[in-house]
Regions:
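Membrane-proximal, glycine/serine-rich, low-complexity loop/turn segments characteristic
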Residues: 21, 62-64, 78, 82-85, ...
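A short, solvent-exposed loop/turn motif at the edges and junctions
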Residues: 46-52, 74-90
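Outer membrane beta-barrel strand-and-loop segments of large Gram-negative receptors
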Residues: 372, 508-510, 553-560, 665, ...
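Short, acidic Ser/Thr/Gly-rich low-complexity loop/linker segments typical of extracellular
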Residues: 48-64
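Signature of Gram-negative outer-membrane beta-barrel scaffolds
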Residues: 498, 524-627, 800-805
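Short, ordered, surface-exposed loop/turn motifs in non-cytosolic proteins
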Residues: 33-48
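Conserved C-terminal beta-signal and adjacent last beta-strands/turns
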Residues: 773-794, 806-920
């Protein structure tokens, strides 16, 4: 009896123990990308000891599952679902367990991610396209500029200016920092391609635009060069020198040193064969990066003779350029402090002889004008940039930017011209000599305070800025004009001998505060307020000689002295949505502008008031990885500048006299743009499309009055309706592998309808241009590289003044490049660029260009660190400067000097000293 009781008790305890060692497992199964629950997914438990199935179940319609009566122990959990990658995870069961949500991944997406991690050349994430540098083969000693030429969607011209995905690159960063201020060529033409890890390209946005998520639609592109980690240790640089031992020379020195997070760079160049871009854009606020907020008043301070060859050279004439600079940057205390200091000097001398032939389409018929110019110019610039950032903690930061720019320019030249009637009889002949000097000193300061909050995405930012600009310009002009009657017989001569001076000072102050508030995990509200003020004083006077031979007699009708007080208040409200595959923004801004203009000559006061509305909307959709679609709309007001509003007469060119119009209205522009980007990993193909369309209301154009008896033109600005423009860029590329062909094509176009007035008659011109380009290439590392890029274009222009004239023509262009590696480390290369265009009836001659250049290079030293080469530029001596312009009232061919055939013997040495690496 006792044994029976003990046995019964043992069985009960064993049963309870077994019951205690069983558990219930539950969870939820979902799609990782769509965040949707998966119905009927299979969940299996496999014993770890022998991988046999212990139990299994399926999910219900809500994606939930329960595995009851599971013995404790070690298992593998296997989850399967059609088209999804299997999920296998070890699991230890000790008691009841809820594993939460298991996100399953589509097999197609998983494959893409694996390929991306192991060998993808291109990645698209949001607005950023990233290129893995080592995926694109470049020759030894290549620069970043050479690398960019290999990337899909990039073009680089002879000045070093870059176009990426159809838009001009206006900023190049190195590891997120500017490299010598606002000269992008300093990075692209001097940093070695082998030092680059990745190249990123994205829309250029100010800090305010990054907060709002909205843009103007007219932004350019920013390129960020991310260096390899081993390239940021030690020192590297380049020494380059070339000469023909007679007339031409080209030299460059660059040194970079990294010590921890400290960076020191210095450079110097001297050349008369390629001055590069020097300074791509003389921004109104030089050097304040592209996150500087321009205000509504930027058009209200103007200067006489403000342009210079730093902006206008455009490969016209023969250059003689010097540049030098130094840069220091450092981050310390866990990157809480960041300083960036740089100095840059530019000196550019140019000489140019040019000819411009023009056919004028007037209501009364055709006339002709020819102009012959000679120009010598010397421009110099000193630019100092300083930036300091301080992150007080994870939520608060300050940034101070200070910039000084000093520029001087001296230009001497002469312009001779003639105006002919329809029978090509002389109406006038002009002879002009000028001597102009300009000086500008500019100081700009910006202070930024940024405050984050513990609530995610809540942010407050305030920007203060203060700037002073001083202009001092003077010029002498002597013009002699001979007039003829209708039969071409000489009548009389008119002479102008004047001195023009301009002294101006502008002081600007602005503040802008932006607050971002998350309304939910999907919605966000961004509001901002800005106040800007501009105080300007402009003294612009024209003098003629007195009896003592000095320029001291004031000509009041061509003089103007005024003081401007302009200020604006503006506000914006933007509602943003961001969830899964969709990003959306909608909002509007409103600003009021008041201009107070004091005429110091006549003691008059004028006021102008403008109301500006800027509605905007953006929509972005990511249907799948590596694909991006977007559409943007922005409405902007176009208010007249002071130079357009004030009734000042300008006779700098006596045959083309300008005067202002105080009755101008504010214009409005509707701009819409659409873009599409897609990269397919498996096929290594990339497609990009950008399209934009603009409609202008109350656009400001010109009212021209031409006196056919004298050939003199008087013009002033007026408002018109009906102007519009469009732009298309598209590019497809496939393949980038070693020894594998790469090919692609591009379809581009642009057009506009432009309205102005000539002798009281409204003139409408419709111009459209389309082009198709193909590209094919193949290369093998250190063996050969071949590419051919032909293009064909068609230009059509029709004016209501000359409906019978045919100004349509084809253009043919392209490039053929070949490079072959020979034994003994010898390399030969050949490059042919051609630009051919169809003849039009307006001109007897036509200009077609075929530019053939070639070189032979011998590699030297260890790791091919040195090179000696012989280079021949423009072997056919065919590099003639030429542009053609077709407008509503004229067709013009402009011919100018360019550097043509020359030969250079060049030596190049790239050096580096990296820890643990080899010295070169």
């Amino acid at each position: 009896m006792l044994k029976t009781a003990v046995f019964t008790c043992f069985l009960c305890l064993s049963f309870l123990a077994v019951r205690a060692q069983q558990a219930v497992i539950s969870g939820n199964i979902a799609d990782s990308s769509e965040k949707q629950n998966l119905h009927l997914a299979v969940i299996s438990l496999l014993r770890k000891s022998d991988t046999t199935i212990a139990t299994y179940t399926r999910t219900n319609q809500q994606g939930k599952f329960v595995l009851p009566k599971v013995d404790t122990g070690l298992y593998f959990m296997l989850i399967t679902y059609p088209r999804f990658a299997d999920y296998l995870e070890p699991i230890e069961i000790r008691g009841n367990k809820d594993i939460g949500t298991v996100n399953m991944t589509l097999k197609s997406k998983l494959l893409e991610e694996v390929v991306i991690k192991t060998g993808s050349a291109i990645r698209i994430k949001g607005d950023t396209t990233e290129f893995v540098a080592d995926s694109f083969k470049v020759k030894a000693g290549a620069t970043v500029e050479d690398l960019l030429k290999k990337l899909p969607g990039f073009t680089v011209n002879s000045k070093g200016e870059i176009v990426a995905q159809g838009k001009r690159v206006d900023k190049v960063l190195v590891d997120g920092e500017e490299f010598f201020g606002d000269d992008p060529t300093m990075a692209t033409q001097n940093i070695s391609a082998k030092a680059v890890d990745r190249v990123q390209v994205f829309e250029t946005k100010t800090e305010q635009q990054q907060l709002t998520g909205m843009s103007t639609g007219n932004e350019g592109k920013t390129v960020n060069i991310k260096l390899k980690e081993d390239a940021k240790k030690g020192a590297f640089g380049k020494l380059y020198a070339g000469t023909d031992f007679n007339k031409y020379y080209d030299s460059k020195l660059l040194y970079n040193r990294f010590v921890g997070k400290k960076k020191l760079s210095a450079f110097g160049t001297r050349t008369n064969v390629n001055a590069g871009s020097l300074n791509w854009e003389d921004r109104q606020k030089l050097g304040i990066e592209n996150d500087f907020e321009f205000d509504e008043l930027s058009g209200y301070y103007f200067s006489f003779g403000g342009n210079d060859d730093f902006n206008d050279w455009n490969l016209r004439g023969l250059p003689d350029a010097w540049t030098a600079g130094t840069l220091f940057s450092n981050k310390w205390n866990s990157d809480k402090h960041n300083v960036n200091l740089s100095y840059r000097f530019n000196r550019l001398g140019t000489t140019n002889v040019g000819t411009t032939m023009t056919q004028n389409n007037l209501p009364s018929g055709l006339t002709y004008s020819n102009r012959y110019t000679t120009k010598n110019a010397l421009n110099q610039q000193h630019a100092v940039n300083a930036k300091y950032e301080w992150k007080l903690d994870s939520l608060t930061s300050f940034k101070i930017v200070a910039v000084y720019t000093g520029k001087t320019s001296h230009t001497i030249g002469k312009n001779n011209g003639e105006f002919l009637n329809g029978n090509r009889d002389s109406v006038n002949q002009s002879f002009n000599n000028y001597d102009n000097s300009t000086e500008r000193n500019q100081i700009d300061n910006q202070f930024t305070y940024k405050q984050l909050f513990k609530k995610k995405n809540r942010q407050w930012q305030t920007v203060l800025r203060y700037g002073i600009t001083d202009d001092n310009n003077s010029g002498l002009t002597n013009t002699r004009i001979r007039f003829f009657d209708s039969l071409g017989v000489y009548k009389n001569t008119d002479t102008t001998d004047q001195q023009k001076s301009f002294d101006g000072r502008s002081t600007t102050f602005g503040v802008k505060s932006t607050f971002t508030e998350p309304l939910s995990d999907r919605w966000m509200l961004v509001v901002d307020y800005a106040y800007n003020r501009n105080l300007s004083r402009s003294l612009r006077n024209t003098y003629e000689k007195g009896t003592n031979g000095k320029y001291e007699v004031l000509i009041s009708e061509f003089s103007n002295n005024f003081q401007l007080d302009a200020f604006s208040h503006s506000g914006n409200a933007i509602l943003r949505y961001n969830w899964k595959k969709i990003r959306f923004g909608l909002g509007s801004g409103v600003s009021t502008v008041k201009l107070g203009l004091d005429d110091l000559d006549n003691n008059n006061h004028s006021q102008f008031h403008f109301l500006n509305i800027t509605p905007q909307a953006q929509f972005n959709y990511v249907p799948k990885p590596q694909t991006n679609i977007g559409i943007n709309y922005r409405g902007t007001t176009r208010q007249p500048t002071i130079n357009q509003l004030q009734p000042l007469r300008d006779n700098t060119d006596p045959l083309n006299e300008y005067k202002g119009n105080p009755d101008l209205k504010v214009g409005f522009n509707h701009g819409i743009s659409i873009f599409f980007n897609q990269y397919k990993v498996l096929s290594q193909s990339w497609l990009g499309v950008n399209f934009s369309y603009n409609i202008q209301e109350n656009a400001i154009t010109q009212f021209n009055t031409i006196d056919l008896t004298t050939g003199k033109r008087t013009y002033y600005p007026v408002n018109v309706n009906g102007n519009h423009s469009w732009y298309l860029w598209s590019n497809y590329n496939k393949g980038k592998g070693d020894k594998k062909p790469r090919y692609g094509f591009g379809l581009n176009g642009n057009g506009n309808r432009f309205i102005n007035f000539v002798n009281g008659q409204k003139v409408e011109t419709n111009s459209n241009a389309v082009s198709l380009s193909l590209n094919f290439g193949i290369d093998a590392d250190d063996k050969y590289d071949f590419s051919i890029n032909p293009s064909v274009g068609y230009n059509a222009s029709r004016s209501s003044l000359a409906t019978g004239n045919n100004n349509n023509y084809f253009t043919y262009g392209g490039q053929v490049y070949a490079e072959v590696e020979l034994p003994w480390k010898v390399e030969i290369n050949s490059n042919v660029n051609f630009d051919l265009r169809q003849h039009i009836n307006a001109f007897a001659s036509n200009t077609n260009l075929v530019i053939w250049s070639a070189g032979i290079t011998k590699k030297l030293f260890k790791k091919d660190a040195g090179k000696i080469s012989f280079y021949a530029n423009d072997l056919l001596d065919d590099n003639k400067g030429f542009t053609r312009t077709i407008n509503s009232t004229f067709i013009s061919d402009d011919r100018f000097q360019r550097i043509s055939r020359y030969f250079l013997l060049k030596f190049e040495w790239s050096f580096n000293k990296m820890p643990g690496g080899e010295k070169k």
